[in-house]
């Protein structure tokens, strides 16, 4: 496993570019934020105490109330000709009654139904984490790659490998699994995209 590209040390910033955030601090102005607040209360976003840095998203109380984030500026063009790597660590309080997404997407107010991106997603009503590679609303779906649990951290990663025409994904540092890059979104700049939607009131 140590020879897999996605487990290599971080590359030099002189030959690569990227975005890194441990959420020791948070500036809402860096993000395009989309919320729905039909239930009681309001969506909130705040730093919270926790080793390594933690960012807490709290939705309003209604079914389908949500809070989604797109990093401003679409800075990542994934053509498949160069290596690209993404990783994130997160948890959800209710692993069943929720929809969430984490990955790279175009800026969209509906990231659960986006047209272009490479991302991890979970649907309401189950605990199955899925991995999606999507271009122009046509996707390669790899379903049920992991079972989410309430209030339990998960680490997800993907690596675009130009040498094999594959996109590799990994959960909790397990052996990477490769999927075809047929639907790699190579004609759109992408950005960091994540968020959560309530599955019940």
Language-model region placement:
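Extracellular carbohydrate-recognition regions
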Residues: 1-37
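Extracellular glycan-recognition surfaces and repeat-rich motifs
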Residues: 29-56
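Secretory/extracellular carbohydrate-interaction modules
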Residues: 58-130
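Beta-strand-rich interaction surfaces with strong enrichment in secreted/lumenal proteins
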Residues: 71-78, 141-148, 180-182
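Short, aromatic/His-centered strand-loop micro-motif at the edge of beta-sheets
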Residues: 133-155
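Localized edge beta-strand/strand-to-loop motifs within extracellular or lumenal beta-rich domains
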Residues: 152-167
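Short strand-turn-strand beta-turns centered on an Asx-Gly dipeptide
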Residues: 171-175
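Flexible glycan-contacting loops in extracellular carbohydrate-active proteins
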Residues: 179-201
């Amino acid at each position: 496993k140590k020879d897999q590209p996605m487990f290599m040390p971080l590359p030099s910033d002189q030959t690569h570019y990227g975005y890194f955030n441990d959420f020791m601090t948070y500036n809402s102005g860096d993000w395009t934020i989309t919320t729905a607040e039909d239930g009681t209360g309001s969506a909130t976003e705040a730093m919270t105490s926790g080793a390594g840095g933690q960012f807490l998203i709290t939705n309003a109380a209604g079914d389908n109330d949500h809070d989604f984030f797109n990093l401003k500026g679409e800075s990542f063009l994934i053509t498949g000709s160069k290596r690209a790597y993404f990783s994130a660590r997160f948890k959800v309080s209710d692993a069943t009654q929720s929809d969430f997404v984490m990955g790279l997407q175009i800026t969209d107010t509906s990231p659960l139904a986006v047209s272009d991106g490479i991302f991890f997603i979970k649907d309401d009503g189950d605990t199955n984490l899925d991995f999606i590679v999507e271009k122009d609303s046509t996707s390669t779906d790899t379903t049920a790659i992991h079972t989410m649990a309430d209030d339990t951290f998960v680490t997800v990663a993907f690596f675009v490998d130009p040498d094999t025409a594959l996109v590799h994904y990994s959960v909790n540092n397990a052996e990477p699994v490769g999927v075809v890059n047929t639907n790699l979104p190579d004609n759109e700049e992408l950005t960091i995209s994540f968020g959560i939607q309530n599955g019940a009131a």
